[in-house]
Amino acid sequence: THLIPATLEGRALHNVQNAMTAAAMAFSLGIKLDAIRQGLRTFDTTFFQAPGRMNVFDEHPFKVLFDYGHNAHAIAAMADLAQRLDVTGKRIVVLAAPGDRRDEDIIEIARVAAGKFDHYICRRDDNTRGRDGDEVPRLLARGLTEAGVPEAAIEQIHDEQQAIDTALRMGQPGDLLLVFADALTRSWKQIIKFRPEGTPVKTVSTPVLSEPEPAADPQALAREAELRALMEGTVRDERGVVFAREQDD
């Protein structure tokens, strides 16, 4: 598994399972083993390849795990990963749940995270999906306390940006921050642009202007136009996922 970056050297057991499943499916479709190996070795969980899917940022004094997990199974998998990573400091989590889930589903998200972290910050999404502004954080906090987490280890910060900022400012060298995010691009930028107190701002060198690009190949333009026609009527979200618009039967 050390040759499969998406498994984080085998610590991300759910991605070990995903890699095995993907390899088996590809092989059953007749894809050559060399191509399967190449795919597994070159795919990683950077924000650019898989936004919101176990992204790691370790350029702060602490490590940040960033994920879009929004159900109990996803939260449990990431909490398990947080336990498997080598952490010399504290484990801090920014926890959330979609507002259109049942109360018991939201409480279950809290339950599977309970006992895995030193500090919990409970928040809501920008879109509360019909719930009151503080309802989701309150249910999460309730689930944590019912599972035995001390009240002193639980914070309720409703706003996503404020919750993430609080976690970042709380982070110390050796800590691990697990951030469950909803507004992916905004939250990722917030994490990578954060500057801990006392950290000098990096100077930005003046970019070197590149040579003008040659005129586009007519065949390439034709292929691009054909692709745009095929994609007409679809919707792409900020994660890069493409959906077909719903049509009446």
Task: Give the location of each predicted region.
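Acidic-glycine-rich active-site phosphate/pyrophosphate-binding loop
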Residues: 1-2, 53
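ATP-dependent carboxylate-amine ligase
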Residues: 9-14, 21-34, 38-249
